């Protein structure tokens, strides 16, 4: 066999190994997106919140730029508190990986009673944030602000 023929199977194996390491989308973040859409009556694309201000999206630092960014900061802190709960401290049970039950009825978000302690806490974090988002004005200038103004969130 020609050595070049070994490159194809090797490439496939390396690709499969790489794909196996791609993490799935955290489950409760999917639900959080649904709660945002429910509370906001689908008025905004949920991706508009993915990189807004200093706290909306992954991570967060500095001073929130406005009321909506403060909603995201409070949500981040709520998730931090969830990770400290004994009921949420084992692998795949924290705020990002723990799916919970909820209801959405005409813009009203309710966390259902069948959630355990950890799921109930996470659901309430997301519910509170979704309601906060619905009441806070959205300033287009603050979308992707960390790219527009490099040092604003330090």
UniProtKB/Swiss-Prot annotation:
Subcellular location: Secreted
SUPFAM superfamilies found in the cross-reference section: Phospholipase A2, PLA2 (SSF48619)
PROSITE patterns associated with the record: PA2_ASP (PS00119), PA2_HIS (PS00118)
Record note on cofactor: Binds 1 Ca(2+) ion.
Disulfide bridges in this chain: 38-104, 54-153, 56-72, 71-132, 78-125, 88-118, 111-123
Propeptide: 20-27
Reactions listed under catalytic activity: a 1,2-diacyl-sn-glycero-3-phosphocholine + H2O = a 1-acyl-sn-glycero-3-phosphocholine + a fatty acid + H(+)
Superkingdom of source: Eukaryota
Binding-site residues for Ca(2+), renumbered to this chain: 55, 57, 59, 76
Active site: 75, 126
GO cellular component terms listed in the entry, alphabetical order: extracellular region
Leader sequence residues: 1-19
InterPro entries: PLipase_A2 (IPR001211), PLipase_A2_Asp_AS (IPR033112), PLipase_A2_dom (IPR016090), PLipase_A2_dom_sf (IPR036444), PLipase_A2_His_AS (IPR033113)
Alphabetic keyword roster: Blood coagulation cascade activating toxin, Calcium, Disulfide bond, Hemostasis impairing toxin, Hydrolase, Lipid degradation, Lipid metabolism, Metal-binding, Secreted, Signal, Toxin
EC number, UniProt record: 3.1.1.4
Keyword Iron: no
Function per UniProt: Snake venom phospholipase A2 (PLA2) that shows moderate enzymatic activity and exhibits procoagulant activity. PLA2 catalyzes the calcium-dependent hydrolysis of the 2-acyl groups in 3-sn-phosphoglycerides.
Protein name stated in the entry: Acidic phospholipase A2 2
Species of the source: Pseudonaja textilis
Higher taxonomy: Eukaryota, Metazoa, Chordata, Craniata, Vertebrata
């Amino acid at each position: 066999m020609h050595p070049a023929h070994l490159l194809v199977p090797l490439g496939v194996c390396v690709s499969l190994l790489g794909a196996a390491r791609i993490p799935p989308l955290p489950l409760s973040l999917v639900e959080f997106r649904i709660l945002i859409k429910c509370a906001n009556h689908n008025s905004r694309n949920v991706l508009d919140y993915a990189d807004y201000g200093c706290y909306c999206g992954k991570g967060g630092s500095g001073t929130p730029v406005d009321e909506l960014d403060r909603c995201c900061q409070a949500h981040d802190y709520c998730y931090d508190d969830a990770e400290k709960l004994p009921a949420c401290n084992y692998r795949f049970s924290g705020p990002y990986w723990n799916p919970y039950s909820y209801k959405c009825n005409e813009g009203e978000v309710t966390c259902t009673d069948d959630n355990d302690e950890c799921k109930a806490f996470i659901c309430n974090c997301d519910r509170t944030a979704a309601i906060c988002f619905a009441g806070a004005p959205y300033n287009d200038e603050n979308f992707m602000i960390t790219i527009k103004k490099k040092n604003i969130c330090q």
